[in-house]
Regions:
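Structural motif
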Residues: 16-20, 76-77, 110
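A short, hydrophobic beta-strand element within the central beta-sheet of small alpha/beta folds
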Residues: 71, 92-97, 101-120
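Conserved phosphotransfer microenvironments
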Residues: 52-99
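Non-catalytic signal-transmission and effector/linker regions of two-component phosphorelay proteins
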Residues: 1-42, 125-146
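Conserved Asp/Asn-Gly motif in the active-site loop of CheY-like receiver
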Residues: 45-53, 136
């Protein structure tokens, strides 16, 4: 059976993390807290940069038209990609290079310094729509704010 996702809610969060489908995923509680604070959230899990981008491309018309709001939250490291240690930075760079530079993005990571270094290496333009944090409270605020 194949799953078809419809990202046509008003507040969509594309959450990119290679462990997001694991039952003991470390951020499961964070996701639940955000949803409990804002039941209008539609969290769309993606386990790779490529699957996230394919999903976003399929809704580009809606995103660009402002009909539907998307935010992206990502970890920095994904062991199912190569190179693994800068997957979040590569996602941000890909978004900027493919017409998604106006989407709000958060890198939620264990090392803000490393994330900023990787973003700089890839010449990511650090506009006000890109946030990097290690704090759960920042992630919750990002997820639930409109």
């Amino acid at each position: 059976m194949r799953q078809i996702e419809i990202g046509l809610y008003v507040n969509n969060i594309v959450w990119v993390d290679d462990n997001i489908l694991n039952a003991n995923w470390e951020n499961k509680g964070l996701m639940e807290m955000a949803y409990n604070k804002n039941r209008a959230l539609k969290i769309i899990p993606k386990i790779t940069t490529n699957t996230a981008m394919a999903f976003l491309k399929s809704f580009k018309t809606f995103i660009k038209g402002g009909t539907i709001k998307y935010k992206i939250i990502s970890d920095m490291t994904r062991n199912n990609e190569y190179p693994a240690d800068n997957a979040g930075a590569r996602l941000v760079k890909y978004l900027q290079n493919n017409g998604f530079g106006d989407i709000e993005i958060m890198i939620f990571t264990s090392s803000k310094e490393k994330a900023l270094r990787e973003l700089k290496k890839l010449n990511v333009v650090m506009n006000g729509r890109i946030k990097v944090t290690t704090f759960t409270s920042d992630a919750i605020n990002f997820l639930v704010s409109n």
